[in-house]
């Protein structure tokens, strides 16, 4: 272990050795190899970063918006140039296959591209005449220092929801990446600095509870963006709000896919396999439950089982691999425990992913549990793994009722060619992001990532116009300019 590199925090434009007493191993989940060690930084280090970020904000917020946008454009171009390197880093520390990693990098680039439109996004509103000789204008201003807490499952895309937009709009930023996937952030920091970002505007502090609490409690930090599990998200929202911060917390999910009798069988199976088992099911837009109409159920499920059994499992860097590992051994054990809990509660295991035949790494194969009911733990809980529950239903109305019983409401999908059914689904389903004949309805950067119910805590979502509102506050100026003396 003496040769394992210890990562440093990034504060005021410099890589600074942490004062942490504890470091955690960063592991390649496909091989078990220790890639590096990440510091579990102290509260004092977070507080130091906050002071630096506040000082940087005073200057950065005064930089002309088009000039800030040019830094973002330069950053975007550098990301494009290093796309393959970034993708390989994601696969190395996260485990998802290289194709998925490339897709994630592209999504991150698109978020930076959207943020580079800051001159348009920052525009306010005005009305030339609200009364005699009186006009009003609405101006946007950055809120100040912003904190971000990011998860392991999308180490590029999710942070790129946060810091590029916040910084483009004139804020400074402190990011706590996941301690499980910190390597990618090193490269992003390097490229952002190369793009011309001034020192102190973007800071990275690795860590765990102390750093999270620092972000939530430090008075300098005015807003917090979080993506992660429901229990932590609830804590972040309650604690941050109690400290008078703006908070957006994107949390858990249990996404339902509805398959109706008229669905295109081959296309639907392909989409469900990708949505349920892509990224090892470790994404908040994964398909967790399929509700399938009785008329197509037997044929659909037979094809789905066959497709799941033919999925290639292995190291995401290897050619042809579709399903990589889950992030850690404890996640693997937790997933297997959920599968066995499903069996205890009466579900039927038709594709068993507990044994993959791989001697190293933390793998769970595609798993399908049928005859699931809404009182089962596997239906209620977010498993966050390649485990798919199946419920047979009589019709669309029943499928919607099943989905709406979940405490989560991130996304939902329907496969059908019936326009009336699509309209009914759109109007009646309780979910913020809907897909029609596609499996993962994650919106582009210019639309909000709009989970409902226990999938989101806050008012303003990530991405889209919501993100502009979240990272800015407004001043309305009402002015009287008498035209007396200019009469014709």
Swiss-Prot record:
GO BP annotation list:
inositol catabolic process; thymine catabolic process; valine catabolic process
Q: Which residues bind NAD(+)?
A: 150, 152, 176, 179-180, 229, 251, 382
Active-site residues per Swiss-Prot or TrEMBL entry: 284
- Identify a single GO molecular function assigned to this protein: malonate-semialdehyde dehydrogenase (acetylating) activity
The pathway entry for this protein reads as: Polyol metabolism; myo-inositol degradation into acetyl-CoA; acetyl-CoA from myo-inositol: step 7/7
Which of the seven top EC classes does this enzyme belong to? oxidoreductase
- Top-level taxon: Bacteria
What SUPFAM superfamilies would the database entry show? ALDH-like
Record EC number: 1.2.1.27
Assembly and interaction partners? Homotetramer.
Protein role: Catalyzes the oxidation of malonate semialdehyde (MSA) and methylmalonate semialdehyde (MMSA) into acetyl-CoA and propanoyl-CoA, respectively. Is involved in a myo-inositol catabolic pathway. Bicarbonate, and not CO2, is the end-product of the enzymatic reaction.
Name of the protein: Malonate-semialdehyde dehydrogenase
Gene coding for it: iolA
């Amino acid at each position: 272990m003496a040769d394992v590199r210890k990562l440093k925090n990034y504060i005021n434009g410099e890589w600074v050795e942490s004062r942490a007493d504890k470091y955690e191993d960063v592991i390649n989940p496909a091989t078990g190899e220790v890639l590096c060690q990440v510091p579990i930084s102290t509260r004092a280090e977070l507080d130091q970063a906050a002071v630096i970020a506040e000082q940087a904000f005073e200057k950065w917020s005064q930089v002309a918006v088009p000039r800030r946008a040019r830094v973002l454009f330069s950053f975007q171009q550098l990301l494009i140039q290093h796309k393959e390197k970034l993708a390989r880093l994601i696969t190395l520390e996260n485990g998802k296959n290289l194709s998925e990693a490339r897709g994630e990098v592209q999504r991150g680039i698109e978020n930076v591209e959207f943020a580079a439109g800051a001159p348009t996004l920052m525009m306010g509103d005005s009305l030339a005449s609200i009364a005699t000789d009186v006009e009003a204008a609405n101006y946007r201003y950055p809120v100040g220092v912003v904190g971000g807490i990011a998860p392991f499952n999308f180490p590029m895309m999710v942070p790129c929801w946060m810091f590029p937009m916040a910084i483009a709009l004139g804020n400074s930023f402190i990011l706590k990446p996941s301690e499980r996937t910190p390597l990618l952030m090193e490269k992003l920091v390097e490229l952002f600095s190369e793009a011309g970002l001034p020192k102190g505007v973007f800071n990275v502090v690795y860590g765990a509870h102390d750093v999270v609490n620092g972000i939530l409690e430090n008075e300098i930090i005015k807003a917090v963006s979080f993506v992660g599990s429901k229990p932590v998200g609830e804590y972040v929202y309650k604690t941050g709000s109690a400290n008078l911060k703006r908070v957006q917390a994107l949390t858990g999910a249990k996404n339902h896919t509805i398959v109706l009798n008229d669905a295109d069988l081959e296309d639907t199976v392909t989409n469900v396999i990708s949505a349920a088992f892509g990224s090892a099911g470790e994404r908040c837009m994964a398909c967790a439950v399929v509700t399938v109409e009785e008329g197509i159920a037997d044929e659909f499920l037979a094809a789905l089982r066959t497709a799941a059994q033919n999925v290639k499992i292995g190291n995401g860097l290897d050619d042809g691999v579709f399903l990589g590992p889950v992030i850690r051994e404890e996640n693997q054990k937790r997933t297997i425990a959920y599968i066995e809990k499903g069996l205890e509660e009466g579900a039927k295991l038709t594709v068993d992913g507990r044994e993959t035949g791989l001697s190293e790494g933390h793998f769970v194969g595609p798993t399908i549990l049928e005859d699931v009911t809404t009182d089962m733990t596997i239906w209620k809980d977010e498993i966050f793994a390649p485990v798919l529950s199946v419920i047979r239903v009589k019709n669309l109305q029943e499928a919607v009722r099943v989905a709406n019983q979940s405490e989560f409401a991130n996304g939902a999908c329907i496969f059908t060619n019936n326009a009336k059914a699509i309209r009914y689904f759109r109007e009646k389903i309780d979910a913020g992001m809907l897909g029609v004949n596609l499996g993962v309805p994650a919106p582009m950067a210019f639309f909000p990532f709009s989970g409902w119910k226990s999938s989101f805590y806050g008012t303003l979502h990530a991405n889209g116009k919501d993100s502009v509102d979240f990272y800015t506050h407004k001043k309305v100026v009402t002015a009287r300019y008498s035209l007396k003396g200019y009469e014709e």
